[in-house]
Amino acid sequence: MTRKSIAIDMDEVLADTLGEIIDAVNFRADLGIKMEALNGQKLKHVIPEHDGLITEVLREPGFFRHLKVMPYAQEVVKKLTEHYDVYIATAAMDVPTSFSDKYEWLLEFFPFLDPQHFVFCGRKNIVKADYLIDDNPRQLEIFTGTPIMFTAVHNINDDRFERVNSWKDVEQYFLDNIEK
């Protein structure tokens, strides 16, 4: 039997990128922004006057290297690899300076994944997997397999896709019905 494949986004799915951006912007501009303030919006729409600072933070060398891993992501992804071909599909073209940081981060926190399964791209319609777990509705819209939205503060009002709220939900979605 052929194994199904799952492509997984990195930012806001495997890694808490937004939390780190908010911390850095708050520190540099003394803002005090809380995650809850986004309420269905992107950070750049909540503080448009600081869009340049957000870009500066994202382009800072090392930014993507030190992100926190989302709770349970490592253990669930490892379990998924026992039954599925798992790929990491990250839109690194949005921040071209992020390539090496993202690669090193993936090697450190997901050492059980084959680096040949890391896909650094722009638009994820090039990824030919059975499933895509992503927080970005634009990427899910163009994906040709089954799109699964990973909940993030900016997408909470989007109901166009099947949704998982956490890595425990991902585990339940993909592994609960696997025959043992």
Swiss-Prot record:
GO molecular function: 5'-nucleotidase activity; metal ion binding
Official protein name in the record: Putative 5'(3')-deoxyribonucleotidase
Keyword vocabulary terms for this entry: Hydrolase, Magnesium, Metal-binding
Similarity section: Belongs to the 5'(3')-deoxyribonucleotidase family.
Lineage, top ranks: Bacteria, Bacillati, Bacillota, Bacilli, Bacillales
InterPro entries: 5'(3')-deoxyribonucleotidase, HAD-like_sf, HAD_sf
Active site, UniProt feature: D9, D11
A Pfam family matched in the record: NT5C
Superkingdom in the source lineage: Bacteria
